[in-house]
């Protein structure tokens, strides 16, 4: 029976081998034929019958390992794809940030042009109003004021071409109840007068801020935290309070154009502009001398009875204990 199993499982080659081994005595009969009454040892059968099962399990394990390996490769490929996409997005974002920064830098001059455009706008409005009046009141010498007035009286309007007439004369005629001025001329004069008044009221104010003026002057000064830097802050503060920042700016630029140094230009501002004449320097409250910039330490002096800005006194440093030192240039 065992031989049949062996034959079934292993084929005729193995069966012939067993026969040869039995005939030569190399395999004892006691190991092959077992008494039916005695329970046969299942070891040979177990070994022979379980070998295919073990092979199947091994095959399944190999298949499982292959599937896991394939899944791992797919996961790795997916992760690499995601990493590549994230890198591309990061590069695109960095490129966009660079372009936005470049665009901001390019638009900065346009923003700075706003003040110039505003100034041109009001200048053009005033120029148009003056031109309307100019066409009606000035021109060829042959068209005298008397001829123009005669034309007014006859036709009730301004002559078609330019004519000579002074601005003050029109103003006097408008105030005169008996004066005859054409409606078109009157309207042109009113437009010019209202435009001039509007410019003086709305555009006569500083077109530069205290911060901008401070930065402009700082760019011309060497070092940092010097007595002249302190003077710039004082000048800008007083200029803002007195609404004269544009005058200070013009005076500073004029001094530089004349060849003066920035320090000399600042001193000239304190001496030429009335707001600084006989003006007392501001008081700066500090805790100790260490709060004063190092560049100003050598310019500290005892405070005189009546310090003035136009005499070189920039500010007064007031300590907590009541003592005071003046910054002198």
UniProtKB/Swiss-Prot annotation:
Localization annotation: Virion; Host cytoplasm
Coiled-coil annotated spans: 84-108
Modification comment: Phosphorylated by host IKBKE. Phosphorylation contributes to efficient viral replication and transcription. Ubiquitinated by host TRIM6 to facilitate virus replication.
First-listed, main subcellular location of the protein, grouped into a coarse class: virion
Ubl conjugation in keyword set: yes
Domain spans labelled VP35 IID: 204-329
Organism: Sudan ebolavirus (strain Human/Uganda/Gulu/2000)
Site of covalent link Glycyl lysine isopeptide (Lys-Gly) (interchain with G-Cter in ubiquitin): 298
Family: Belongs to the filoviridae polymerase cofactor VP35 family.
Gene Ontology molecular-function annotations: RNA binding
Protein name according to UniProt: Polymerase cofactor VP35
Cellular component, GO, one term: virion component
UniProt keyword annotation of GTP-binding present: no
């Amino acid at each position: 029976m065992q031989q049949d199993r062996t034959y079934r499982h292993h084929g005729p080659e193995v069966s012939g081998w067993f026969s040869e081994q039995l005939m030569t005595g190399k395999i004892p009969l006691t190991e092959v034929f077992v008494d039916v009454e005695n329970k046969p040892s299942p070891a040979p059968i177990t070994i022979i019958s379980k070998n295919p099962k073990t092979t199947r399990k091994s095959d399944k394990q190999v298949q499982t390992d292959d599937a896991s390996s394939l899944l791992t490769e797919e996961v790795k490929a997916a992760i690499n794809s995601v990493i590549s996409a994230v890198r591309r997005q990061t590069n695109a974002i960095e490129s966009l940030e660079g372009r936005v920064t470049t665009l901001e830098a390019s638009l900065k001059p346009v923003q700075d042009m706003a003040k110039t455009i505003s100034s041109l706008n009001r200048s053009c409005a005033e120029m148009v109003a003056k031109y309307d009046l100019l066409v009606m009141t000035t021109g060829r010498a042959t068209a005298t004021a008397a001829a123009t007035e005669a034309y007014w009286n006859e036709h009730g309007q301004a002559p078609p071409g330019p004519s000579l007439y002074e601005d003050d004369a029109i103003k006097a005629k408008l105030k005169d109840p008996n004066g005859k001025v054409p409606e078109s001329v009157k309207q042109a004069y009113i437009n010019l007068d209202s435009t001039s008044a509007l410019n003086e009221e709305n555009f006569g104010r500083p077109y530069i801020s205290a911060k901008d003026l401070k930065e402009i002057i700082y760019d011309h000064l060497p070092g940092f935290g010097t007595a002249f830097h302190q003077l710039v802050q004082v000048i800008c503060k007083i200029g803002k309070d007195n609404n004269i920042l544009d005058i200070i700016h013009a005076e500073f630029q004029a001094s530089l154009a004349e060849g003066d140094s920035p320090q000399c230009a600042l001193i000239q501002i304190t001496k030429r502009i009335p707001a600084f004449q006989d003006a007392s320097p501001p008081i700066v409250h500090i805790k100790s001398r260490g709060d004063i910039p190092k560049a100003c330490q050598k310019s500290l002096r005892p405070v005189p009875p009546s310090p003035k800005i136009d005499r070189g006194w920039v500010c007064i440093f007031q300590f907590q204990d009541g003592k005071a030192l003046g910054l002198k240039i």
